[in-house]
Amino acid sequence: MNLNKLFTALRQRKNVPAHNQQAGRRERYTHALEQFLDGHQPAVRLGGVYTLANLADEWLTDASLPEQVRREEAQTIIDSLTGCIRTPYPLAQKRQILESDEAPEEYEGDFARDQEALREEQLVRRTVFKEFSRRLAAVAENNKVDKAESQHAVPPISPTWADLRFDFSGAPIFYPLRQLHFQNADFASTTFYGPADFSGATFHGETSFSAAQFTADASFNSANFNDWVGFSAAHFAGTAEFSRSRFADAASFATVTFTGEADFSDAVFSAAADFAVSAFKSDADFSRLNTEGIASFAAVTFEGKAVFTASTFHDEAHFAASVFNRPAVFSKSLFGGAARFAGIVTKQSAMFRNVRFASAADFSGASFTQYEDFGGARFDGDATFSRASFIALPRTRYEMDFPQHANFGNATFAQDADFSQATFTAHVGFYKATFARAVSFNGASFEGAYFADATFGHGADFRQTSFMYVKPSFVRLWIGGCRGHGSRHRRIRRITCLRRARRARTVSGAARRNFLIERSFSLSARCCTTRIPGTKSSRSTPASVSLRSKT
């Protein structure tokens, strides 16, 4: 007998049990799928779910097959189960009604029967997620370094489960999914009827909720996203709760609409957090937010109160062109990277009290209304407020309790500060503010200004600056940075524009009358030779102040 034919016959005989086993799995798969789809009793349908999940385990652990074949067979089963999850269910839209204790008036249909049918469908569909979760949790547990010392007993599941895809896109979800594990989950364009509960859930692999519709409250409290997650273009009709959630990779909430209150308090973003062009229709709570990567809130609209109290931005923070229609609160926050607030609009109070800007802070072109508080703020990098406007709108009887002024009292500017072309139609206070380096108010316009006890450690540029209606106060002003005069800081006592203008030789009577309405002056600590109007000597004068009427 030919040896080649003998070896071929032996191989075929050896593979007969394997082929029979694979054929048996396919027969069980067909039967289980029929049970799941066509069974009229919940117990029968649940039996089909368990059988299908176990068959996926068998395929993945069959060492006689190539890994690709094992994965393809298991993926076929997963696709069948997720396909059933995506199947429309008419009673899903009535979830909140059917979960009530009593039938509402004029309810169409048999309320009791519909209640029972909804509960059964919720049980079966949620069981599919629970079977997935049980295996994915086991994979995560087995991947731990000290899995031998784990307190949780888990079955030996193939890590190939972590490579499978779970497509729930467009599905109707009408049951809670809290404290479950998900892997490579696609919830794009999914509609969540009633409360969407993912609290305590863990997401592995890339996760998508893009364009998802949350018709009621949504809870992701204490959820963990271990890889990229996207909520772009999603809509939250109720409250959106992400308190204490953790994002290990980049997270996108771009163009999301939050109709109800949004709670991201104590959330941690270890990579980029993108909320650009989102809309918050109600209050947004980001207090104690922690972002390790770039945080983008550019062009965001806040219709309600925006709270970022005690938040930490380790990298760049972008709020450029955002609109705050209600109070914006950033008090006690830390900006480790560049803070970009260029072009923002605040319609009510803006609170930046005791904020630390460790890098550059850009508020150029910003528009502030009502009340701005930068008291105790610290600017370690360049601070730019060029072309910013501080506007006091006419008060109404509903706004009488809102003070209308800008406060930079006790603020510290460690690097250059630029307020050029800024407009303050509300009173602004720089009481005890410290400018360690050059500061420019060139071309700025003040309704009223208070610089008492302010310290200018370097050049201070007030050229073309105008003070309208209310004379500025420079009581106990300190100006430094003038070389060749001994001490670094020299004190100028009681510089009052109106008094000096009346004694200055260059100011005519007509100009003085005009000066009472609108005055401008130039203050520079870089020149030490020009006499201050009203003084007798220029030798000990550390800076020059020239007062002139604005024509």
List the predicted regions and their residue ranges:
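Intrinsic low-complexity/IDR segments
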Residues: 1-551
